């Protein structure tokens, strides 16, 4: 594992057949990360990663049948999710562009990180939060405890969006954890006025 004394900048991963980048533990800080047209998640976080990130850019490859998430974020190491530290990265100024048929985030296993001042567009929906029955150590509890935060983010051009129900339509199941997360301070469904130049991603 790499500690917070290390900063990694200007990394591009293009057209990989797996994840773009995986953070498994540690506290390394990163800036200017570009994950383009990879076939699995763009940003995969697990095993207690607690670094800081800024300017994370992702554009998802459409592989059909529901492409993978923009980010799959796990909190702890299986099978015991109660062990500290659970993952808690802090990310600012991310821009993620989906493949239209995939979710932006899958959050699970006691993950408790933060995203602020970011843009997520062209996904099917924003959040899937997994909450195992009978467990007090879940990402849902991290939302309740105030340690899983999404504040002042823009969501746009999502297939599941319904103007009548608003932000609540951007959740996978519409459960209480997902609704609480999308409803946090400053989140909005609005056109970021960004234009993507066409590319096949091949």
What is the predicted function of each stretch?
Residues 1-18, 22-202:
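Extracellular beta-rich repeat passengers
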């Amino acid at each position: 594992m790499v500690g917070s004394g290390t900063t990694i900048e200007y990394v591009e991963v293009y057209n990989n057949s797996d994840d773009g980048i995986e953070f498994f533990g540690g506290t390394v800080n990163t800036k200017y990360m570009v994950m383009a047209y990879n076939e699995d998640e763009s940003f995969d976080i697990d095993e207690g990663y607690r670094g800081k990130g800024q300017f994370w850019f992702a554009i998802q490859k459409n592989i059909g049948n529901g492409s993978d998430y923009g980010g799959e974020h796990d909190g702890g190491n299986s099978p015991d999710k109660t062990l500290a530290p659970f993952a808690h990265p802090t990310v600012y100024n991310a821009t993620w562009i989906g493949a239209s048929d995939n979710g932006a985030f899958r959050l699970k296993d006691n993950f408790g990180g933060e995203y602020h001042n970011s843009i997520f567009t062209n996904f099917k929906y924003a959040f899937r939060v997994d909450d195992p029955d009978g467990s007090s150590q879940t990402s849902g509890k991290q939302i309740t405890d105030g340690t899983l935060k999404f504040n002042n983010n823009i969501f746009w051009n999502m297939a599941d969006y319904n103007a009548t129900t608003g932000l609540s339509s951007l959740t996978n199941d519409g459960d209480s954890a997902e609704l609480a997360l999308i409803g946090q301070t400053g989140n909005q469904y609005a056109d970021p006025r960004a234009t993507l130049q066409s590319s096949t991603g091949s």
